[in-house]
């Protein structure tokens, strides 16, 4: 071993001790999770929920766009129809063990029924418990868009009421009045 190799080795040791000394008194990045809350960015994508419109009905019209947009195929649903012609999902199932929380299902949904919330505490001991049914996904409120009602915007009539007479429904727009 030459003197040059000895000095290089000593220099690397001094540099390592110096770096450790600098980082020893720096603020720690590790958070003690259950005791300290975790900072979540404003657009954090967590648990998927199904929302309701302002009238209290479920927003999902079972158009199947969310299942088609899902890159891993973790969403499955079956369409059914009420007496007044509205579509709804007979069953709606999401397998969270396969979901990558990409948000493509939320973007594809025309009724804003499917939304990603900042909830991330979904740990289970069995994989079968990560398959959520419609009853597990439905929340009581409208979610991020409290005033949006798909059927009011679409103009579909409700059985027994004329267009524009339903609760939270706007009067129909006369398209001829919009012409220049």
Curated annotation (Swiss-Prot):
Residues holding [4Fe-4S] cluster 1: 60, 63, 66, 109
Catalytic reaction equation(s): a quinone + NADH + 5 H(+)(in) = a quinol + NAD(+) + 4 H(+)(out)
Known cofactor(s): [4Fe-4S] cluster
Entry GO MF terms: 4 iron, 4 sulfur cluster binding; iron ion binding; NADH:ubiquinone reductase (non-electrogenic) activity; quinone binding
GO biological process: aerobic respiration; respiratory electron transport chain
Bilayer disposition of the protein: Peripheral membrane protein
Signal peptide per UniProt: none
Note accompanying the cofactor annotation: Binds 2 [4Fe-4S] clusters per subunit.
Cellular component GO terms held in the UniProt record: membrane; NADH dehydrogenase complex; plasma membrane; respiratory chain complex I
PROSITE patterns: 4FE4S_FER_1 (PS00198), 4FE4S_FER_2 (PS51379)
Domain 4Fe-4S ferredoxin-type: 50-80, 90-119
Primary location class: membrane
Keyword field contains Disulfide bond: no
Keyword Iron-sulfur: yes
E.C. no: 7.1.1.-
Pfam families: Fer4_7
Subcellular location(s) per record: Cell inner membrane
Keywords for this protein: 4Fe-4S, Cell inner membrane, Cell membrane, Iron, Iron-sulfur, Membrane, Metal-binding, NAD, Quinone, Repeat, Translocase, Ubiquinone
Binding site for [4Fe-4S] cluster 2: 70, 99, 102, 105
Function: NDH-1 shuttles electrons from NADH, via FMN and iron-sulfur (Fe-S) centers, to quinones in the respiratory chain. The immediate electron acceptor for the enzyme in this species is believed to be ubiquinone. Couples the redox reaction to proton translocation (for every two electrons transferred, four hydrogen ions are translocated across the cytoplasmic membrane), and thus conserves the redox energy in a proton gradient.
Protein family (similarity comment): Belongs to the complex I 23 kDa subunit family.
Subunit: NDH-1 is composed of 13 different subunits. Subunits NuoA, H, J, K, L, M, N constitute the membrane sector of the complex.
Name assigned to this protein: NADH-quinone oxidoreductase subunit I
Gene name as annotated: nuoI
């Amino acid at each position: 071993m030459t003197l040059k190799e000895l000095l290089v080795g000593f220099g690397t040791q001094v540099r390592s001790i110096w770096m450790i000394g600098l980082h020893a008194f720096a603020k720690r990045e590790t958070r003690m999770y259950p005791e300290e809350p975790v900072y979540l960015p404003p657009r954090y994508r967590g648990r998927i929920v199904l929302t309701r419109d302002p009238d209290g009905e479920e927003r999902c019209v079972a158009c199947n766009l969310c299942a088609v947009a899902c890159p891993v195929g973790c969403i499955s649903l079956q369409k059914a129809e009420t007496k007044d012609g509205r579509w709804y999902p007979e069953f709606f199932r999401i397998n969270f063990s396969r979901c990558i929380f990409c948000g493509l299902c939320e973007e594809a949904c025309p009724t804003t029924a499917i939304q990603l919330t900042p909830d991330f505490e979904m740990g289970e001991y069995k994989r079968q418990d990560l398959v959520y049914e419609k009853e597990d996904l439905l929340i009581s409120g409208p979610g991020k868009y409290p005033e949006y009602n798909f059927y009011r915007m679409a103009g579909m009539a409700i059985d027994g009421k004329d267009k524009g007479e339903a609760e939270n429904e706007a009067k129909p727009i006369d398209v001829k009045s919009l012409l220049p």
